């Protein structure tokens, strides 16, 4: 019988091409052998005694083999190779056990003799004593066999051995298939699981498998494939022109050290697996990364003979749907283990803390009022926003950038009272700046049918010489692709004392809808000046882009000029719009609609794209009137104003407002709508130890680090175009202890010093006043954490990052709202190099190299050309705003006064005593 079973097992192994048979296959062999050897011929002739004898014989063989099996399993657990004979013994023993089990539990209970014995036992027939004794013995043997089967400990080990061996055989088969596959092939979730399992059990000296997750850090931290060797490479951190060196030095600059070390050993792994989600942009970047690793690995070439690179079929969603979907892990640190000091203390970037995003800009409301709700349900193109919102909820990770520079400062805890004097001194964020490109938000383009290519940048540029791409850009000859490098911003300007208090963020009742008869060109049939007490979009108002979208060419005349109707004291808005549209880079992206792909519906402080959409519509209307209009009819910006009022009630009414506040509001609002990190939570403040170490660094390096931290929560084209940074340093005059905070700005408000009777005031005087060391009054003295009491102290502001476009607000109003009308002389070409922090002493935080901190354009000199002036006449509440804007070499300077505009005969007229907000563009080579 034994040889017969062995022969059958071997035949089945050959048929299934496997060294091991499954439990089901071995059970089938046992059933076949019972029919072949035991119940042949007439089953009725088989007696109970013969079957029990057969079981006892097989059981004795089973017990004998079990001793050998214990040694075999013990050797396997120690990692020893198992011979074919040992495998056969184990499989044979399982068949023996199964034969006994089937006979005892199935065949014998069906015998008529067994049924009679059970009946006799139950009735206790004393008339057949001899028969009863014989039956009693048979029943005892049967019960003993049954009990032996139930208590046998070996069968569980045998089953476990067979199952694990089958699994390992499958893993080996999957791995053999992978070994035969070429780099760039797709592997299934089954094959990946086999590789992961094989790697965990491998005794090989070669590292087996490295997984690269190509999603945002936030999504990676939420969940990723559970394996030891895995890194996150954010899709926005690299581009097609990168090499493997760039990936290591730029893309992974803010990654945890453990991940950087794994990537540095990439050429030592047997398999590298790339995976991402279903997002179109991420899938494209996955192919880009594959190409970099295969064709541009110059520092550590990857050989297909030694390391194979595969792509996970169906990506992470497919893994979740597979049988292995439960094998995922989360990387969110517990609140008790957050270490945010990393970069300052030891250069470690792994302690990233993700918290809830606070309100960064007081001018953008958390919740929208009723009129904005009307805009969200408007019947025309605004429903694109709703579609975008639905799709972006599925692809939310694209909007979340959790740069590892957060990790550089993972220890931002709640503000320390000892380290802060007031809200003015709370850490916000800062940097050295050039121009990183904003992260692309690959949501569907809401402007359907627009086939124009998008020139909006795709990835942040982290190299030092990124500035050189702008060296040849002249304002009159702007290359439309010149802003392929873009950096971020979200901030409050240092506002004039009269306007530092922001209106409370309360919900306003729904305003009365006002139907305005708008013609196809967006002109109002109302008079030039409309003065409703409040305005609201009616449900009949539409946002159809078809009448304002340009046709086919990208060669826009960015120096178009169109007047704007005054909607009732809205000159404050008109003058800022005219000046801002003098910023060619900004005008370009709203004309070619590339901005639309970057709207972040999930930005916590944004308007869900409302403000950006209405601003774009206004730009289109103005451009269309310039191109098509014969009479140059002024445009009514009423819908744009309604959108502004829906976001901030300060601009809902027809009352006069401060134009610099509107400028701040507009840029903040556009930033939040386009903020690709608007869903990211912020970091906590530094621990006292980390802050102490930061104080020892130069402003140049500390501000650069703080700027990178800022970019993890605020990253948009607005940031790149307008964002700067200054440092505010408090110093104790007793112990010389300092505390420095870094504040981003969009509009830089500078004070006007008292006029010297002998000399005129220059804008350089204003900057000197802004950056001078100030002795704090007794009631303002700093609570020095070193002295642990209020001490005589000083405060000094230093500009640490100068933006590409600098907006300067001359603080003409004092705390009593009195206006300073002194003439501040400002040049057409302004050199701010002397006011830029240039104190680098060669010292970096421990573990951080000089090539790890991006310069982002912060290379002197810093020279700026004037291109816009917003002027104010009268008082704060009863004045009027106009604007001077430079419109290229052909048109020169134009003067805008609401609906009217005219050329300026003498450009020196743009330098006047009514200047209130100045717009400068950085220039090179002058």
From Swiss-Prot:
Residues 562-923 form the USP domain. It is an enzyme of class 3 (hydrolase). Pfam families: Rhodanese, UCH. The keyword Disulfide bond does not apply. It is a peripheral membrane protein. GO terms for cellular component: late endosome membrane. The active site is at residues 571, 880. RFU1 is an inhibitor of deubiquitination activity. Residues 205-328 form the Rhodanese domain. Its EC number is 3.4.19.12. The modification Phosphoserine is found at residue 443. Gene3D superfamilies: Cysteine proteinases (3.90.70.10), Rhodanese-like domain (3.40.250.10). Keywords: Cytoplasm, Endosome, Hydrolase, Membrane, Phosphoprotein, Protease, Thiol protease, Ubl conjugation pathway. The keyword Nuclease does not apply. GO terms for molecular function: cysteine-type deubiquitinase activity. Signal peptide: none annotated. Ubiquitin thioesterase that acts at the late endosome/prevacuolar compartment to recover ubiquitin from ubiquitinated membrane proteins en route to the vacuole. Also removes ubiquitin from soluble proteins targeted to proteasomes. Is essential to maintain a normal level of free ubiquitin. Involved in the ammonium-induced down-regulation of the GAP1 permease and the UME3 destruction in response to oxidative stress. Has a role in the RAD9 checkpoint response to TOP1 poisons. Required for promoting coordination of DNA replication and avoids DNA overreplication. Residues 1-208 are essential for the localization to the late endosome and constitute a late endosome localization (LEL) domain. Belongs to the peptidase C19 family. This is Ubiquitin carboxyl-terminal hydrolase 4. The gene is DOA4.
